[in-house]
């Protein structure tokens, strides 16, 4: 069980690094200088990494940044190119895909681990993102 937990933690860290490299790739070869925006973005990304498995709300992220929900939603989309919920779900789906590859946990268990409490919703988003169900993804 200890080995499985270590593997799980490494999978999460690896998926996060891949996700951050994609984000950096979308914004050029490097992140902008340390500005208020980059500090806020770092705060939100750390919040997502720490809380992705919980029912993380836009209100929580806006509060972490010290701004209103409406301002946060506009700002986050400007910074990342996508809305907060879409970004959070992409992060969760990346982690789920990694867990499907490296563990034999059930799809239901993986969905719950990455923050989806509705299996049908998870399956629908996963299929939209990867073009196949989680079970099909695992068997490929």
Regions found by a protein language model. Give the residues of each.
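Short, Lys/Arg-enriched, Trp-marked, Pro/Gly-tolerant hinge/linker segments that flank
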Residues: 2-13, 17-50, 54, 58-65, ...
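Flexible coil/turn residues that form the inter-helical turn or adjacent wing/linker of helix-turn-helix
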Residues: 5, 54, 103-104, 115
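Generic recognition of well-ordered alpha-helical segments
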Residues: 18, 43-46, 74, 98, ...
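Basic/polar phosphate-binding segments, predominantly the helix-turn-helix DNA-binding elements
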Residues: 49, 54-91, 111-140
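Residue-level recognition of oxygen-bearing side chains
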Residues: 105-106, 121
């Amino acid at each position: 069980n200890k080995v499985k937990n270590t593997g799980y933690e490494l999978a999460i860290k690896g998926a996060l690094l891949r996700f951050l490299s994609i984000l950096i790739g979308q914004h050029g070869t490097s992140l902008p200088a340390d500005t208020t925006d980059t500090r806020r973005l770092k705060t939100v990304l750390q919040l997502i990494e720490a809380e992705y498995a919980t029912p993380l709300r836009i209100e929580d992220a806006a509060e972490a940044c010290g701004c209103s929900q409406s301002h946060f939603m506009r700002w986050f989309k400007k910074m990342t190119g996508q809305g907060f919920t879409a970004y959070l779900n992409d992060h969760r789906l990346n982690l789920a895909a990694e867990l499907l590859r490296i563990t034999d946990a059930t799809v239901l268990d993986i969905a719950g681990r990455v923050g989806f409490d509705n299996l049908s919703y998870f399956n629908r988003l996963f299929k939209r993102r990867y073009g196949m169900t989680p079970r099909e993804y695992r068997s490929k």
